[in-house]
């Protein structure tokens, strides 16, 4: 890791349809093998499915779903003396968003619907309604942090 100066973060250009940086970042999370147009197609199809099912603005559903999944606290391993402890740590804002997006993609890929856009729409709607596998992952993360509260004084 460089010690001289902090490396500047690259700017993410907002996407073309919704003019949102969050959507553009999520397209990058969906993308595999550099196929960005395929990833955009999947996300926009998922948004159309969500709009069809709920009659609400898909961007609002998406943003609320991401906010519902964002973890506040997580555990990190730290070696103290000869044993490893799981230490609860607060999650930084940009990591919260990144984790939420990663969890949505992981659990939407393991869903049973046929098309990826349907899987993604289903997971986003579940997250919007505070249910589903990605919400369970967030709750498990919080539960782990709560269980290891006794080791919070080992924080660095």
From Swiss-Prot:
Domain of life: Bacteria
Magnesium among keywords: no
Keyword list, A-Z: Ribonucleoprotein, Ribosomal protein, RNA-binding, rRNA-binding, tRNA-binding
Example GO biological process: translation
Gene3D superfamilies found in the cross-reference section: Ribosomal protein S7 domain
One Gene Ontology molecular-function label: structural constituent of ribosome
InterPro entries assigned: Ribosomal_uS7, Ribosomal_uS7_bac/org-type, Ribosomal_uS7_CS, Ribosomal_uS7_dom, Ribosomal_uS7_dom_sf
Any Gene Ontology CC annotation: small ribosomal subunit
Quaternary structure note: Part of the 30S ribosomal subunit. Contacts proteins S9 and S11.
PANTHER family the record matches: RIBOSOMAL PROTEIN S7
Entry similarity comment: Belongs to the universal ribosomal protein uS7 family.
Primary role: One of the primary rRNA binding proteins, it binds directly to 16S rRNA where it nucleates assembly of the head domain of the 30S subunit. Is located at the subunit interface close to the decoding center, probably blocks exit of the E-site tRNA.
Protein name according to UniProt: Small ribosomal subunit protein uS7
Species of the source: Desulfatibacillum aliphaticivorans
Taxonomic lineage of the native organism: Bacteria, Pseudomonadati, Thermodesulfobacteriota, Desulfobacteria, Desulfobacterales
Gene name linked to the record: rpsG
């Amino acid at each position: 890791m460089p010690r001289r100066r902090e490396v500047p973060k690259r700017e993410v250009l907002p996407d073309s349809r919704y003019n949102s940086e969050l959507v553009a970042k999520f397209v990058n999370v969906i993308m595999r093998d550099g196929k960005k147009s395929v990833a955009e197609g999947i996300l926009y199809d998922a948004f159309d499915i969500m709009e069809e099912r709920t009659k609400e603005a898909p961007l609002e559903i998406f943003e609320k779903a991401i906010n519902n999944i964002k973890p506040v606290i997580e555990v990190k391993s730290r070696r103290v003396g000869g044993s490893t402890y799981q230490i609860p740590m607060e999650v930084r804002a940009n990591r919260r968003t990144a984790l939420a997006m990663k969890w949505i993609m992981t659990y939407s890929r393991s869903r049973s619907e046929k098309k990826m856009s349907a899987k993604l729409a289903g997971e986003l709607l579940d997250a919007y309604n505070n249910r589903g596998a990605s919400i369970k992952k967030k709750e498990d993360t919080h539960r782990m942090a709560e269980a290891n509260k006794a080791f919070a004084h080992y924080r660095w």
